[in-house]
Curated annotation (Swiss-Prot):
Pathway membership: Amino-acid biosynthesis; L-histidine biosynthesis; L-histidine from 5-phospho-alpha-D-ribose 1-diphosphate: step 6/9
Disulphide bond pairs: none
Signal peptide: none
UniProt GO MF annotations: imidazoleglycerol-phosphate dehydratase activity
Membrane-crossing segments per the record: none
Family affiliation: Belongs to the imidazoleglycerol-phosphate dehydratase family.
Enzyme class: lyase
EC number(s) per entry: 4.2.1.19
Keywords: Amino-acid biosynthesis, Cytoplasm, Histidine biosynthesis, Lyase
Protein name per Swiss-Prot or TrEMBL: Imidazoleglycerol-phosphate dehydratase
GO term, biological process aspect, one: L-histidine biosynthetic process
Cellular location(s): Cytoplasm
Length: 185
């Protein structure tokens, strides 16, 4: 289990391959997206987030959940031996379409291409989506690329989380952990 406590938040994340999943955050759309990401990644466990002091529009909760998720995923991956390493997925969702590609080779990088309006959905400012991905990628030591398009911003962001989850599932599947260097990272 990974825990993070700051003056603003208290986060606890436990991840495992498969099994039941429980996610609770003070931001309904964040809860929905984390559930979506982990379910499509084939991960079980729990994510519990509490906001101890409200300072802004949820920035600290969203960021700290991404930090904790990334660190818990990094711990779950361990030495990253025996995994496929790479994963990618395309997800259509009504009017929206998202692509995600990941490399779990231990080198953090992120790129998100998605035009999102400056609005909030369920307490989640959509401008935080790229920051969530960047933070998750950095803490998980993963390369993450996401492209999403569509008319409905909810569908666009949800399709992106589904695609990222499916890409993670593929990358975590048993495999050779290919590397021309002989080591990852």
């Amino acid at each position: 289990m990974y825990t993070r406590k700051t003056l603003e938040t208290e986060i606890a994340v436990e991840l495992r391959r498969g099994g039941a999943l429980q996610v609770e955050t003070p931001i309904p759309f964040l809860t929905h997206m984390v559930e979506t990401l982990l379910k499509y990644a084939g991960l079980g466990g729990s994510v519990a987030a509490r906001e101890l002091r409200r300072l802004d529009d949820g920035h600290h909760v969203i960021e700290d959940v991404a930090i904790a998720l990334g660190r818990a995923l990094d711990a779950l991956l361990g030495e990253r031996k025996g995994i496929a390493r790479f994963g990618w997925a395309a997800v259509p969702m009504d009017d929206s379409f998202a692509l995600a590609a990941v490399d779990l080779g231990g080198r953090p990088y992120w790129a998100v291409k998605a035009k999102l309006p400056d609005v909030s959905i369920g307490g989640y400012p959509l401008r935080m989506f790229p920051h969530f991905v960047r933070t998750l990628a950095a803490e998980a030591k993963a390369t993450v690329h996401i492209y999403a398009r569509g008319a409905d911003p909810h569908h666009k962001v949800e399709a992106a989380h589904k695609a990222l989850g499916l890409a993670l599932r593929q990358a975590m599947a048993p495999g050779e952990s290919p590397s021309t260097k002989g080591v990852l990272g």
